[in-house]
Amino acid sequence: MSSFDGHRHALTDRLDLRAVAEADVAALHRLTSDPVHSDHIPGGLQETPESTRAWIERFRGRWDITGLSYWTVRLRATGEVIGIGGAERRPGFWNLFYLLDSGFWGNGYATELARAAQRGAESIDPDLPLVAWIHEDNAPSQGVARRLGLTDYGLLGAAHWNGEPMHYWADREPGARLRSV
């Protein structure tokens, strides 16, 4: 196993963060197939439980390779699954991602999750920038990025998601590798 197993389970004040697992497919499919999230899911909505399973399998595999990936997000008080997110290592940067059930928006959970991901990424490889790719009209996600101390460096290269340009939010200026993304 990875020497970073300690990151597979993290607790915040209100959240229980556990590495995504096969047992989470049904709960995460409810989230990733909900049309209200269509603009916020990499690759778009997950049409079937099988597509959700394949999507989270990719994240599961990254835990052993890089020591950090995405967690299933649960409320500590109830154990209810309310989202997915974390930091995934990509070539030259940590990709910050957070997606919460819309019924839990506006309560600070995304910021709490993102801070845990930020701490994890910094503890594993602080030399890599932490990056969030955010639609220019996604004000709530921009607010989370600001609370983490990230800066909006604007549109960068050819970065697109679902055909729309994404803003590069990061904890430092983009290097040459990211300018070409």
Show the residue positions of the predicted features.
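Active-site rim helix/loop that mediates acceptor-substrate recognition in acyltransferases
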Residues: L45-G67, R76
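Acyl-donor (CoA/ACP) binding surface of acyl/acetyltransferases
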Residues: M1-H40, E57, Y70-V181
